[in-house]
Amino acid sequence: MNAHTLLSQSLVIDCHLDLLYDVLQKRRQGRRQVILNDYWADWRAGNISCIVSSLYCDDSCDYLSEALQQIAALEEEVAESTGEFFLATCAADIRHAQATGKVAVMLSFEGVEPLVGEVSLLRLFHKLGVRFIGFCWSRSNWAADGSRFKDALYIGYGLTEGGKELLALARKLHMLVDVSHINDLGFWEILNSAQQPVL
């Protein structure tokens, strides 16, 4: 079986793409239809049915505003398209995308900085379509300690009390928890208490 045949017979999901970070930067420069012009051909060539787009915010921004603007940019990109891709919130959306040759775009926190320490804001982001939650992007934040690359002996603190509360709410909302970038203690805290699969 060659790669093309394998791809054509498989459900292909890209579980991490910094899509909206890039899209928003390009839209700020005046570009439109960024996804169609810069990504669509590659998605089709790879037979991708679902993209999990991270909501990533760098240190130099207003985290809450930046995450909301990234979601708004996706909404604008969907409106500018002719239905090739759409915001997805459940497995049925992914199956629909696969059956119709479209791409389901799902949203994920890559660090919970946009919640600005307010656990209750997770409910609002869930209503906006966010279904995956990664507690940190390597750097530490109010919810969890990130992984460290320069200090192999660093142990850190895992999840904070706020992080534990956030994890409980994420599970209540049936969000998928992504353990990428979190430190070892946080990884094991999440895994040892897991009641459903994690990424």
Where are these regions (language model features)?
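N-terminal hydrophobic targeting/anchoring segments and the immediately downstream early-domain regions
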Residues: 1-156
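Histidine/acidic residue-rich metal-binding segments in metalloenzymes
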Residues: 117-127, 131, 149-199
